[in-house]
């Protein structure tokens, strides 16, 4: 999250410099400080609790102050001399907690999803392999734990693979909603204190910094007051978790025994 806040501050400094609102020397120092944070430096300077009131204002200002003080050092000044680089006037220029924090949150979720998707894809492939390996094994199919009709064990594992594939597709669809940001809307979506140049360049600049295909929301008021994209991805993750839990419970039941349980499979 902190690194993504730094990426936003870097993109903002670039855009404000190009808009000729931020002097080149200050912008260069801010960008350099942001790059240090993105690289994992200065971690001990971020002391604000992750759980906080005020919609993230304290986290936003913590980042602004760290970047400002580091930029001051880079320019040869003394930390705390905000006449050189100011946390709010320069680092936070044309921004608000209300567009910075949700955008950083979306970037952070986007950063975390690839590991999950890779794990799910590996699981999907393994289940498909098992469905082929077990395709010749007959077993009893059941409804409400009562014997129903015969089926192949491979069919059960193919069903699990199909379920996981559906989870993958669902997460990928939800992921796309996170590419839309309200950056440039500032406090409530009015774009107050943001130049026209900044408004039209901040998101493309951030896209270049992050490598994500980001786009600015068509309605900045809606994107500022409604964060249903987070709800969508949360719902898909919960659905995936429920599916995984159900599959694990099935396998646990089928491996029960060995004397008085089902004992149809052996879990390694």
Residue ranges, per PLM feature:
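Conserved, well-structured ligand/cofactor-binding cores
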Residues: 1-268
């Amino acid at each position: 999250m902190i690194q993504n806040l730094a990426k936003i501050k870097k993109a903002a400094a670039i855009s404000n410099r190009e808009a000729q609102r931020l002097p080149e020397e200050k912008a260069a120092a801010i960008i350099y400080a942001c790059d240090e944070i993105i690289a994992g430096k200065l971690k001990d300077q971020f002391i604000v609790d992750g759980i906080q009131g005020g919609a993230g204002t304290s986290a936003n200002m913590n980042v602004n102050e760290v970047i400002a003080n580091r930029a001051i050092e880079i320019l040869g000044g003394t930390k705390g001399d905000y006449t050189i680089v100011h946390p709010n006037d320069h680092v936070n220029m044309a921004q608000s907690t209300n567009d910075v924090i949700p955008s950083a949150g979306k970037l952070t979720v986007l950063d975390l999803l690839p590991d999950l998707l890779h794990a799910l894809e590996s699981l999907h492939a393994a289940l498909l392999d098992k469905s082929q390996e077990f395709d010749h094994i007959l077993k009893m199919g059941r409804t409400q734990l009562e014997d129903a009709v015969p089926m192949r064990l491979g069919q059960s594992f193919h069903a699990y693979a199909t379920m996981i594939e559906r989870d993958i597709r669902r997460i990928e669809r939800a992921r796309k909603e996170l590419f839309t940001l309200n950056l440039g809307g500032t406090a409530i979506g009015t774009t107050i204190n943001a130049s026209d140049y900044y408004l039209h360049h901040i998101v493309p600049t951030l896209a270049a910094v992050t490598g994500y295909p980001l786009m600015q929301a068509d309605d900045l008021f809606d994107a500022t007051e409604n964060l249903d994209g987070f709800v969508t991805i949360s719902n898909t993750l919960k659905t995936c978790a429920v599916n995984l839990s159900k599959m694990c419970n099935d396998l646990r039941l089928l491996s029960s025994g060995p004397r008085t349980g089902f004992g149809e499979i052996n879990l390694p």
